[in-house]
């Protein structure tokens, strides 16, 4: 026992000497040890006596008396099948099945309870807005419901953060409409009221609905929801891409979309409007009719006017401009950036910059375009979110934290290769196709790069974009012919001797289901010009557009005078286009130079007149160019001619410049895109000769924009264009750029 005491003394723990007997010896004196030893001896003796008594009992009674060790053992054992170890190993699958059964049984029970009238949860949802709304502030749409004894609700066709869009039939106007139902919440109502104000402002300046902006018919309050009634439109461009299995549409069709979009942006840039859309993307560009290429821009819910910017976080990420990513002030140029991204996506089928977040987005932009200029990053509040400044003053892209994503070196993912300029288009899929030559792709690439300029101040503006050679038919190349469209506000002049001017234009841009307010071609309409009639025979179409009546956005550096000189150019049988040319800017610097004259003899002329192609002189583009316009059909597998011969002649008034004694003449021909259609079958082609005359020795440069110079003549004069559209069939037919695309009649919300 003494030994045990020593062991206990040097080991601060309890030593178990018998079942249920232990003592702690730390700090005990010898007397204490002896006392404990005596107690231990007494307990053992008592235990031995108990054992002897138990052994004297009969055998059966001994079994009923458990031994001391048996007292701690369980009297009954669980079923081995229910043991946790077995359930989590051998019977693991059974365990999971049981869990699922219990879970789904509870879920089903809750669902059944929810169906009952006594469900407090259901009662809570039903009380929103007297039972008309759900708990998300959205109106509960009921198919077949009739509103205000006028609108019959057909179905829900769209949903977003703003609310919902339903297809409805307007009994009063006997037409289908799309009704945008705003959430019953103050913040959404306030934003929607801004949208209504902007839409009404645009409608006021676009009474004939020819600028590719969705038409707001009316708005009203219904059961505490603001409702916006729009014309019914068709697919959006994302749906169109999906129908191509994301392989993209032809370059010809991309051109038609591009020209309409540039015209729409030119309209939004009108000084009285100055509207920034702030959310341009394929989903917000809708076809008017599933069989035509006319489009309209929708969803102005995020829009604002210049000077009234209220949001910093705008634009969908894939189409977000660098200035927005960098937290810099923005203007109308952000929409041009978005358009550049959209056009590439429409042709390649894939987003150009598909960032998963803002850092990834900027990194993908840098892959293609390189590091933004230092003067931009030096002023950008959020520059250090994406870049780091080197001691020498240059900027480099920050390394990603995770290190998992690897990007190509800045500027090495060339747009040239993405478009397949020299390799037959994206993925080589356009090799050998008409209208997809290297020259066509080079023009497209150049336009895109101008749209994707890092510097918003030098990014191409709609006015100049519409004059880009991508939209012009060339005489010496077989490009942009049968399906191309050139209705830009071109200022084109070439040598000849004539005194009259005319411009040819097709129509397009209306809803396929609504013809309200449309001015149609009048073949006998008399214009107030000295040159005769503008005659045209145009087949009736589901979707029309007209040449715009533009309050022209002036080139950079121009100011609007109090009494501008008017230059009137008649561009359509039923309307005229007036541009205001500031008198203070009419005397612009002249650049003298000689250029080669390209003569293009067309096969069809009125009265045997010889027509020369016009010569456009720019710093970048000096190829002869003419304009063509088409009005095709998307009828699959059929040839459909929608226009017959069209000839015209108009006269433009001349403007004179007196500050230096020289007299100048400039014609601003603004002829936005025709209602060119998605070519789903073989179509007849149409040729247009556009000729304008000027002094070959004097050219006028427009101040404020270094990239373009345009011709102007000295001395009073007139401009002439003689257009003749001929329908050619047989060998000249071109395969449809969208052959094989399935078109389904499933209208998309117009906003």
Curated annotation (Swiss-Prot):
Gene3D superfamilies: Phosphorylase Kinase, domain 1, Transferase(Phosphotransferase) domain 1. Residues 494-517, 623-633, 642-660 have a biased composition (Low complexity). Autophosphorylated on tyrosine residues. A motif (Bipartite nuclear localization signal) lies at residues 109-126. One of its GO terms (biological process) is protein autophosphorylation. Residues 59-68, 477-493, 611-622, 742-751 have a biased composition (Polar residues). One of its GO terms (cellular component) is nucleus. It is an enzyme of class 2 (transferase). Pfam families: Pkinase. SMART domains: S_TKc. InterPro entries: Kinase-like_dom_sf, PKc_DYR1A/1B, Prot_kinase_dom, Protein_kinase_ATP_BS, Ser/Thr_kinase_AS, Ser_Thr_dual-spec_kinase. Keywords: ATP-binding, Kinase, Nucleotide-binding, Nucleus, Phosphoprotein, Serine/threonine-protein kinase, Transcription, Transcription regulation, Transferase, Tyrosine-protein kinase. Residues 589-609 have a biased composition (Basic residues). It is found in: Nucleus; Nucleus speckle. Residues 59-81, 104-129, 477-532, 580-667, 730-751 are annotated as: Disordered. Residues 151-471 form the Protein kinase domain. GO terms for molecular function: ATP binding; protein serine kinase activity; protein serine/threonine kinase activity; protein serine/threonine/tyrosine kinase activity; protein tyrosine kinase activity; RNA polymerase II CTD heptapeptide repeat kinase activity. The active site is at 279 (proton acceptor). CDD domains: PKc_DYRK1 (cd14226). The keyword Secreted does not apply. Residues 585-613 are annotated as: Histidine-rich domain (HRD). Belongs to the protein kinase superfamily. CMGC Ser/Thr protein kinase family. MNB/DYRK subfamily. The histidine-rich domain (HRD) region is intrinsically disordered and promotes the formation of phase-separated liquid droplets that enhance its ability to phosphorylate the CTD (C-terminal domain) of the large subunit of RNA polymerase II (RNA Pol II). This is Dual specificity tyrosine-phosphorylation-regulated kinase 1A.
């Amino acid at each position: 026992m003494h030994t045990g005491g020593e062991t206990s003394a040097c080991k601060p723990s309890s030593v178990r000497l018998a079942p249920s007997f232990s003592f702690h010896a730390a700090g005990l004196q010898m007397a204490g040890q002896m006392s404990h030893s005596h107690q231990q001896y007494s307990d053992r003796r008592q235990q031995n006596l108990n054992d002897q008594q138990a052994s004297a009992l009969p055998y059966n009674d001994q079994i009923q008396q458990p031994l001391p060790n048996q007292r701690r053992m369980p009297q009954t054992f669980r079923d081995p099948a229910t043991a946790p170890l077995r359930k989590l190993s051998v019977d693991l699958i059974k365990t999971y099945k049981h869990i699922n059964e219990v879970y789904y049984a509870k879920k089903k029970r809750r669902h059944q309870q929810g169906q009952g009238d006594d469900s407090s949860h259901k009662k809570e949802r039903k009380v929103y807005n007297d039972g008309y709304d759900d708990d998300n502030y959205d109106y509960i749409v009921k198919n077949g419901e009739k509103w205000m004894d006028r609108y019959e609700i057909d179905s829900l066709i769209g949903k977003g953060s703003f609310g919902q869009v339903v297809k409805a039939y307007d009994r009063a106007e006997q037409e289908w409409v799309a009704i945008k139902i705003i959430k019953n919440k103050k913040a959404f109502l306030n934003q929607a009221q801004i949208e209504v104000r902007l839409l009404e402002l645009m409608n006021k300046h676009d009474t004939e609905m020819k600028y590719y902006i969705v038409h707001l018919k009316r708005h009203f309050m219904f059961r505490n929801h603001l409702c916006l009634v729009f014309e019914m439109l068709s697919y959006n461009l994302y749906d169109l891409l999906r129908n191509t299995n994301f392989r993209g549409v032809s370059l010809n069709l991309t051109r038609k979309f591009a020209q309409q979009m540039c015209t729409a942006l030119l309209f939004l840039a009108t000084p009285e409007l100055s509207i920034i859309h702030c959310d341009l993307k394929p989903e917000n560009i809708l076809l008017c009719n599933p069989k035509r290429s006319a489009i309209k821009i929708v969803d102005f819910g995020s829009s604002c006017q210049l000077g009234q910017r209220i949001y910093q976080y705008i634009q969908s990420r894939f189409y977000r401009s660098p200035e927005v990513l960098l937290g810099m002030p923005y203007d109308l140029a952000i929409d041009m950036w978005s358009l550049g991204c959209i056009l590439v996506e429409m042709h390649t089928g894939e987003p150009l910059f598909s960032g998963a977040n803002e850092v990834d987005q900027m990194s993908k932009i840098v892959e293609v375009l390189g590091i933004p200029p230092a003067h931009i990053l030096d002023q950008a509040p959020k520059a250090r979110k994406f870049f780091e400044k080197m001691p020498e003053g240059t900027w480099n892209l920050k390394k990603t934290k995770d290190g998992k994503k690897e990007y190509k070196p800045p500027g090495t993912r060339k747009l040239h290769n993405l478009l397949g300029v020299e390799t037959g288009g994206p993925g080589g899929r356009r090799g050998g196709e008409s209208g997809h030559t290297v020259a066509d792709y080079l023009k497209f690439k150049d336009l895109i790069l101008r749209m994707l300029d890092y510097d918003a101040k030098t990014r191409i503006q709609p006015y100049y974009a519409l004059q880009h050679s991508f939209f012009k038919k060339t005489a010496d190349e077989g490009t942009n012919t049968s399906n191309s469209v050139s209705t830009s506000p071109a200022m084109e002049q070439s040598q000849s001797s004539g005194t009259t001017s005319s411009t040819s234009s097709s129509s397009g841009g209306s809803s396929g289901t609504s013809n309200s307010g449309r001015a149609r071609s009048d073949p006998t309409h008399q214009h107030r010009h000295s040159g005769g009639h503008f005659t045209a025979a145009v087949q009736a179409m589901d979707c029309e557009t007209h040449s715009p009546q533009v309050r022209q956005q002036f080139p950079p550096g121009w100011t609007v005078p109090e009494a501008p000189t008017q230059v009137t150019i008649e561009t359509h049988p039923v309307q005229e286009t007036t541009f205001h040319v500031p008198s203070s800017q009419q005397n612009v610097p002249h650049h003298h130079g000689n250029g080669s004259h390209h003569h293009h003899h067309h096969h069809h002329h009125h009265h045997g007149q010889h027509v020369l192609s016009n010569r456009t002189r720019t710093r970048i583009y000096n190829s002869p160019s003419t304009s063509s316009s088409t009005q095709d059909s998307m009828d699959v597998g059929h040839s459909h001619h929608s226009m017959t011969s069209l000839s015209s002649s108009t006269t433009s008034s001349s403007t004179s410049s007196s500050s230096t004694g020289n007299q100048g003449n400039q014609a601003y021909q603004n002829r936005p895109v025709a209602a060119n259609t998605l070519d789903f079958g073989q179509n007849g082609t149409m040729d247009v000769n556009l000729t304008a005359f000027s002094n070959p020795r004097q050219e006028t440069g427009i101040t404020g924009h270094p990239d373009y110079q345009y011709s102007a003549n000295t001395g009073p004069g007139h401009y002439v264009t003689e257009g003749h559209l001929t329908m050619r069939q047989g060998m000249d037919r071109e395969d449809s750029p969208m052959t094989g695309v399935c078109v389904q009649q499933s209208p998309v919300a117009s906003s």
